[in-house]
Amino acid sequence: VSADRGAAPTAAPATVAAPPAAPATVAAAGGAEREPAYTVERLERAQDLPRQVWDELAPADDPMWGRDVFTAMQAAEIGPDAYAYLLVREAGRPFALLPLSAVHGLRLDRVVGPRERRLMAPVARAFPRLLRVPMLFCGNFLGQGHVMGRGRLPAAAARLLVREVMDFARGHRLGTVVFKDFAPDGLDALRPGLDEQGFFTVASLPDTQLTLGQTDFESYLASLPAKPRRNARNKLRKFHRQENLRMEVLDEFGHLVPEMMGLYRQVMDRADQTLDVLDEAFVRALSDSTAAGAGAEDGDAEGQGDGDGEGARTEQRLVACFEGERLVGYLHCLFRGRGAVGARIGMDYGLAHRARLYHNLHYAAIELAIARGCRHIRFAQTAYEPKREFGCALVEQSYALNHTGRLPRTILRLLLPPALEAARAQALAPRS
């Protein structure tokens, strides 16, 4: 894996050969017909797959799966040390793609709940290296897990793909392997490969998703149950009573990125868990890529840009709150197809409470998504109580976990499920 995320590799993408035990051609039941041959090829960068092919494989309405998001991750330092992409071909044709993110020193005390972090604190002080583990994340490091593809992954392809994942982990000394935040149907398609390799599953934190379809924001408010509707109107009134505060929606905000990062750090300093921490390079790279339109990009294997269908490219807007000319809050929103994501938030906690800033930033994002005709908007895996009040449903998802060593795998099976389940229960518990 290239450790230089920002530079294009000089060599052609490596090809990962299927092991001899798994022939590329598998006979169908009864031997009367033969299934297509499946092979797996390793790509070093998202740009190594033509944009047109990426958009054919990626979830059409999930903004976190636009190719621009992955190229921005490669250019930044948000947690992973390196990236790779396993491309499944069916009879030579691109059929599915699984992104991989390698973290060689994941800090365990940053990805557990507050109680577990307190228990780990003495170890973290005395032996900090003991809490750093090499880990391979499969799927989207910043979003819900998927295997991008043209359809459900056949069992033969699933076994080959998961086998290649484990070979990749062994080859790069990444002991723990995680298929991160996959929905049940996504894991079901991978089940033949996961079971063959000894993976086990644990429920992860659910996503929150608000189904849309209202004609305007007032219709959305009217659709809420009585108590959340009263609370929403009360919070909107409190915001509008504040002097010199205003909400804007910006499509260009590069000049605000330094202020955004300061507000984002205020939120992250108060976060229970910090698997990923975005940096200025990520925000700028994403802004630059989405502003490029449908033109050719450096390193695009096609170089033409004519494969982009309408809405295929990830778009972004900044829901920004200003006090005078000073940015005091924002919600960074991404759009793709008919889906929206409130990706990351930043706030000045000096006025967040009295202005009900958290709620009002989300209300503005919901209004924006409705105006754009989105079918749904998703928010981060935090602050579940207010998101239930917004009308969001919980989207259940899971981890599939494994280890390249037999003894560590046994220990993981014993210790990790109760720790993750406790952290999940604490995150979902009512706060009032």
Q: What are the roles of these predicted feature ranges?
A:
Residues 1-8, 24-32, 120-136, 165, ...:
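Intrinsically disordered, low-complexity boundary segments flanking structured domains
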Residues 71-74, 117-119, 126-133, 208-212, ...:
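Short C-terminal domain-edge/linker segments immediately following a structured domain
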Residues 36-116, 166, 175-353:
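A conserved beta-strand-loop-helix scaffold within acyl/acetyltransferase catalytic domains
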Residues 81-84, 89-90, 95, 101-201, ...:
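Acyl-donor binding region in acyl/amide transferases
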Residues 5-33, 292-313:
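Intrinsically disordered, low-complexity terminal tails and inter-domain linkers enriched
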Residues 265-272, 288-291, 326, 332-333, ...:
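Hydrophobic alpha-helix feature that most strongly marks membrane-spanning transmembrane helices
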Residues 2-9, 27-38, 102-105, 144, ...:
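Active-site/acyl-donor-binding loops of N-acyltransferases
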